[in-house]
Amino acid sequence: MRRVSLLTIALVAGLSLAPHAQGDGGYRLVPNWPTLPAGMYFGLKDAPPPPAEREAQAAARRATGGQQAAQNNTGGPTNQPGISGLAIDQQDRIYVFNRGPKPVMVFNTAGQMVLAGADQEINGKAINPNWQHSGTVDWEGNVYVIERDAHRIVKLSPKLDKFLMQLGTTGVKGTDATHLDLPSGIAVLKNGNIIVTDGYGNNRVLLYDKAGVLLKQVGKGSGGPNDKGTGPNEWHLPHKLAADAQENLYIIDRENKRVQVFSKDLVYLREIKNEWNPWDIGISRKGTDGFAYIADHLLERVHKMQLSDGKLVSTWGSQGLGPGQFDWVHGVVVDSQGAVYAADTYGQRLQKFVAAAASR
């Protein structure tokens, strides 16, 4: 019930983000974006359910803190259909990590699907789309897919047709260098080093070299009830992350409701806190515009944040199923032109926003 009380307080008080935010964020929804080919869909084919049923489901999730089915290790559905994460490459192609028949779907900025796949067998097991969480694209165009409940991350070729590498051991959780426990996020640096948030089970962040050899761990990572913490270098569900132009890492510490900032070598720099519940962070591939975009689950919003000081300069969105609203906003990326893409998981859709004055 704590989530409900926070929501009520925020609504009554106008949310303490107000001194930091301006208007509706200055962004508008691009209608009818993207265009899905015939027979393709996000999430479940016959969903979403009618609005009244969806609102009842949303109320139940808020009442329980939104955590039901979050650690499904049985092979059954996660009850979280739709889009679980987003990534973007150097050509501004948007990669959708889809809890549906095609685990990865790729779109250009015009909303046309240009590639779909990642449904082949890998190391004796096909990727279960119900278990997907997020992924990324490295600087060579290779795609990393997090199959969270299989405790593994698979690296695929740019066309999604060749298996290249795996982090973690398929179907086996653990706390050592060769195992993961419900991993949640990933970023790849220009030199090929890989950063993984091993979040739901281990509360640790891992640094690997390009070959997948573990170099460093930040966090207790013991896999037990005492591995959480609130201090620097400690975590309560490190969730997703992004890098800026200097390759400083902005890592969502979800249940501590903060962002911890590290150097590319995982040296702690600072934290950013606000009245939010951040789930994802998006920074442009160049990372030079000085802003990040936060997917905030508290009131289902996207915030534009200054990287220099963590100040929120604009915000938009609300809880709901209408255009520009969100029901479980779980992923966000930004392209080189400043367009923002948000994954609406239970809404089973991908929404694109552009600056109000923009025409694209």
Regions inferred by a protein language model and the residue ranges of each:
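Blade-level signature of beta-propeller repeat domains, shared across WD40, Kelch, NHL, RCC1
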Residues: 327-360
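Short glycine/acidic-enriched loop and turn motifs that connect beta-strands
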Residues: 101-103, 150-152, 201-203, 256-258, ...
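Surface-exposed loop and turn segments in beta-propeller and other repeat-based domains
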Residues: 31-75, 118-126, 164-178, 213-233, ...
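Conserved beta-strand positions in repeat-built beta-propeller and related beta-rich domains
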Residues: 94-99, 145-148, 196-199, 249-254, ...
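Bacterial N-terminal signal peptides
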Residues: 8-16
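Beta-rich, blade/repeat-based domains predominating
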Residues: 41-46, 72-91, 122-142, 172-193, ...
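Short loop/turn segments that connect beta-strands within beta-propeller blades
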Residues: 108-112, 157-160, 209-213, 263-267, ...
